[in-house]
Amino acid sequence: METLDKIKKQISENPILIYMKGSPKLPSCGFSARASEALMHCKVPFGYVDILQHPDIRAELPTYANWPTFPQLWVEGELIGGCDIILEMYQAGELQTLLAEVAAKHA
């Protein structure tokens, strides 16, 4: 399977998905740590892809997403953004609402 097809499949199969460095429990950078922590505080299931374990995805995703950095949060096939946007939405209460609605829809 080509990298672009892998990315599209991951995004379509996971209603809430974060591409990050490391894992939510063992993040490998501060931005990924803060972003995944905000997601975990929302208490909804989400998927993740450790881009350090998938250099092909790490290389291809920024072009596909038109977003140059990681982490990247995808919700129902749409790119939400990176760490700053995730944290801003969390602090405003918007992330919790969005993720709760999506999780309920896909439960």
From Swiss-Prot:
From the record, give the cysteines joined by S-S bonds. Answer: none
Subcellular location per the Swiss-Prot or TrEMBL entry: Cytoplasm
- For this protein, the parts annotated as crossing the membrane are none
What are the residue boundaries of the Glutaredoxin domain, all occurrences included?
A: 4-106
Residues involved in [2Fe-2S] cluster binding: 29
List the molecular function annotations (GO) for this entry: 2 iron, 2 sulfur cluster binding; disulfide oxidoreductase activity; metal ion binding
| Keyword Nuclease tagged | no
Answer yes or no on keyword Iron: yes
Annotated positions binding glutathione: 21, 58, 70, 83-84
Query: What GO CC terms are in its UniProt record?
Result: cytoplasm
Q: Which residues form a coiled coil?
A: none
Could you list this entry's UniProt keywords, alphabetically sorted.
Answer: 2Fe-2S, Cytoplasm, Iron, Iron-sulfur, Metal-binding, Redox-active center
Q: Which InterPro entries match?
A: Glutaredoxin (IPR002109), GRX_PICOT-like (IPR033658), Monothiol_GRX (IPR014434), Monothiol_GRX-rel (IPR004480), Thioredoxin-like_sf (IPR036249)
The record ties this protein, via CDD domains, to: GRX_PICOT_like
Q: How does it assemble?
A: Homodimer.
Question: What does this gene product do?
Answer: Monothiol glutaredoxin involved in the biogenesis of iron-sulfur clusters.
Q: Which family does it belong to?
A: Belongs to the glutaredoxin family. Monothiol subfamily.
The entry's protein name is: Glutaredoxin 4
User: Origin organism of this chain?
Assistant: Haemophilus influenzae (strain 86-028NP)
